[in-house]
Amino acid sequence: MKRVVVAWGRFNPPTIGHQKLMDITKQTAGGDPFFIYPTHSFGGKKDDNGFKSNPLPADRKHFWLSKMFPQYRNNIIYDTSIKTIIQLFQKYQADYDDIVLVAGDDQYNDYVRMVTTYNNKEYTYRNIDFVNAGKRDKKAAGAEGMSATKMRYAAATMAIGEFSLGMPKTLKEDDIIKLMVEVVSGLK
């Protein structure tokens, strides 16, 4: 029986905290194929700080994720035909019997409920498993405490030092500034 592991997330904007989700996705896959999908969420509602919670479109998230995490470049997928998690599950049903979804704690329960509801209706898998990539510790420093909300706030207030703390070492300072500018323009 063939198995695939997928991660689905907003990554808006990508942060060092997202590497944990990618690492868990790879670890869960073992030798099986795995893919990481940034959602197509863009613009939309405002967060608690009054900023749009999805400042980057999917193609830019893909670009930045690939640049930030080159070890996963071939696993990070930008596919304009996949705009919902249902479409993601439909994509793999012909080639795989089993699928595992890796998601962050903030969306995990919603995804479990939705994906389970639509099995044998919109798509069919013999087994669907779920992996929670973990809960963020808002008080922790570094990747454990990093959130896209913190990054959006740092960008909006032009706090380049704070924004830089949320970036991996693979990103050079000029790229960090470029990403921050993109986030700022998407927040409005």
Which residue ranges define each predicted feature?
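Nucleotidyltransferase catalytic core that binds NTPs
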Residues: M1-K188
